[in-house]
C-alpha cells in the first residue's frame, strides 16, 4: 500500500506520509530503551515471558499475546477504511470484557485475558505509518515473543469483508505494517490478520479511498467480518495456528463466491 508522496516538514504528521521523521530503532535499541520506563501496576497485571526456543517447552496458554490494531487517532478517522484495525481491537475488547483505559508508549491499551491467556490489546496513537514506534517498545517492555505479536490491519488486495490470518509474511506495501516490522528487526515472523477493504474504484485516489467511510452495504460486510475476526483471534490465542485457522482462511477465501 505504498503511496508515492513527498514528505515536507509541514506534512510530518499526515496519516498517510510514507516515511517516518526519524528512522525506527531496531529491537535491540528498544530493549535498552525499555529499561528506564516506570514500573507501574500495569506491568504487574500481565504475566510476561521471554521467547523460548521450543514452543512445546512452555504451554501456549501461559504465554501472553500482544494484539495490535492499526489505525489513525482522532474522531475524524473513525469508521474509515484505514481504521478497521482499530475497530477489530474494539470488538475484541467488547466481546472479551476488556477495558481500554491505559496510556503507555504512545498507545491506548487494554489488559485482560482470552480464556485464561493474558492479552495486551493495543491501539497505537501515533499515525498509522508510525505504528511500530508504539508497538516496538511495548513488545520489548513486556518481553512478548515475536510469535505472539498479532497485527491487524486493512488490506486492499482482499475483497471487502474478507479476512486472512497468517503466521508470517511481508508487509504487502502497507506502510503501517512495514514500520512495525522495521521496529521488530525487520522480521517476517510476525503473525497478522488482514482485513479486506477492497481496492479504489476506477481512478480514485488511494489516499481518498483509505480515508473514506464504508458504504452501507460495505459496512454490513465489515461488521460481519469483525465478528468472525473475534472468533478467529480467540481460536488463535487458545489453540495457535491449528487446523481450525486453516479452515477459517479457506472459508474466508470463498465466502462471497456463488455456488
Swiss-Prot record:
TRNA binds at residues 77, 127, 129, 175. The record marks 154 as: Stabilizes the basic form of H active site to accept a proton. The keyword Transmembrane helix does not apply. Residues 1-21 are annotated as: Disordered. It comes from the Eukaryota. It holds the Pfam family Pept_tRNA_hydro. The keyword Transit peptide applies. GO terms for cellular component: chloroplast stroma; ribonucleoprotein complex. One of its GO terms (biological process) is RNA splicing. It is found in: Plastid, Chloroplast stroma. Keywords: Chloroplast, mRNA processing, mRNA splicing, Plastid, Ribonucleoprotein, RNA-binding, Transit peptide, tRNA-binding. The active site is at 82 (proton acceptor). Residues 1-49 form a transit peptide. One of its GO terms (molecular function) is tRNA binding. Its main location: plastid. Part of large ribonucleo-protein complexes that include group IIB introns and either CAF1 or CAF2. Required for the splicing of group IIB introns in chloroplasts. Belongs to the PTH family. CRS2 subfamily. This is Chloroplastic group IIB intron splicing facilitator CRS2, chloroplastic. It comes from Oryza sativa subsp. japonica (Rice).
Amino acid at each position: 500500500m505504498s503511496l508515492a508522496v513527498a514528505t515536507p516538514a509541514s506534512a510530518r504528521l499526515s496519516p498517510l506520509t510514507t516515511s517516518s521523521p526519524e528512522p525506527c530503532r531496531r529491537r535491540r535499541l528498544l530493549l535498552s530503551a525499555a529499561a528506564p520506563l516506570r514500573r507501574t501496576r500495569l506491568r504487574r497485571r500481565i504475566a510476561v515471558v521471554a521467547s523460548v526456543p521450543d514452543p512445546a517447552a512452555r504451554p501456549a496458554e501461559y504465554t501472553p499475546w500482544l494484539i495490535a490494531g492499526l489505525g489513525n487517532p482522532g474522531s475524524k478517522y473513525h469508521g474509515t477504511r484505514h481504521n478497521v484495525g482499530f475497530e477489530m481491537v474494539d470488538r475484541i475488547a467488547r466481546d472479551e470484557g476488556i477495558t481500554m483505559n491505559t496510556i503507555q508508549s504512545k498507545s491506548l491499551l487494554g489488559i485482560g485475558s482470552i480464556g485464561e491467556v493474558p492479552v495486551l490489546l493495543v491501539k497505537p496513537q501515533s499515525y498509522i505509518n508510525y505504528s511500530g514506534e508504539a508497538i516496538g517498545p511495548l513488545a520489548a517492555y513486556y518481553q512478548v515473543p515475536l510469535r505472539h505479536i498479532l497485527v491487524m490491519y486493512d488490506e486492499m488486495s482482499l475483497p471487502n469483508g474478507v479476512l486472512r490470518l497468517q503466521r508470517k509474511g511481508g508487509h504487502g506495501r502497507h506502510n503501517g505494517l512495514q514500520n512495525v516490522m522495521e521496529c521488530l528487526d525487520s522480521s517476517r515472523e510476525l503473525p497478522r490478520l488482514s482485513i479486506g477493504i477492497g481496492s479504489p474504484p476506477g481512478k480514485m485516489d488511494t489516499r481518498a479511498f483509505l480515508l473514506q467511510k464504508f458504504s452501507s452495504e460495505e459496512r454490513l460486510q465489515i461488521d460481519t467480518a469483525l465478528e468472525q475476526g473475534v472468533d478467529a483471534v480467540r481460536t488463535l490465542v487458545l489453540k495457535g495456528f491449528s487446523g481450525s485457522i486453516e479452515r477459517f482462511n479457506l472459508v474466508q477465501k470463498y465466502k462471497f463466491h456463488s455456488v
